[in-house]
């Protein structure tokens, strides 16, 4: 089975989206991540339209609220034809459980229920921030493991984590869980605003289920060639 490489579309309007997408290849061969910028500017209709065109979609809104609100939000998102969506693991087990129930309730008959991924610690969070700003006494690996265990028990299908943490998670949480990893930079690329990064080959070696890559693809001279090269390296 081919491991997905998901293109992070850090764009804020449909015009930029329409300029980029044809450069990535045929819709059925492209897995995209839509975040807050595009969703908040263009609304749910753009997600539904892209799904109908054949794109696989990771809708990354990182929901975090009281369980009832998250249930209703997830129920609405499940109607858009997405493959993955996210909540913050720090929202707790009841919220994660509510999100999963909302996705199940909202998915149209005959369609696949979107996979629920819980965000552990953002890849922009360093050990210093974890300890000094979040007042967490655990190591990064311990904190991520604790959040992943909570998410799995609450019904999440997987987690968003750094590739550096996947090996430890697989050993302790199991292989029957998705490990989707941003913070991917091909060799020679700048880290930008990411703190905990790896190459596609390292992510493969350490056991990532899927990787999320943005600027190394979207800002490349030939985005489709860059995308295909990263797919090859990861698979």
Curated annotation (Swiss-Prot):
Enzyme class, spelled out: lyase
GO terms classed as biological process: 'de novo' pyrimidine nucleobase biosynthetic process; 'de novo' UMP biosynthetic process
Active-site residues, as the UniProt record annotates them: 62 (proton donor)
Annotated Gene Ontology cellular component terms: cytosol
EC identifiers of the protein: 4.1.1.23
The reaction(s) this protein catalyses: orotidine 5'-phosphate + H(+) = UMP + CO2
Entry-linked SUPFAM superfamilies: Ribulose-phoshate binding barrel
Any GO MF annotation of the entry: orotidine-5'-phosphate decarboxylase activity
Keywords: Decarboxylase, Lyase, Pyrimidine biosynthesis
Pathway entry: Pyrimidine metabolism; UMP biosynthesis via de novo pathway; UMP from orotate: step 2/2
Binding residue positions for substrate: 10, 33, 60-69, 123, 185, 194, 214-215
Coiled coil: none
UniProt function note: Catalyzes the decarboxylation of orotidine 5'-monophosphate (OMP) to uridine 5'-monophosphate (UMP).
Family as reported in the entry's similarity comment: Belongs to the OMP decarboxylase family. Type 1 subfamily.
Subunit architecture: Homodimer.
Protein name stated in the entry: Orotidine 5'-phosphate decarboxylase
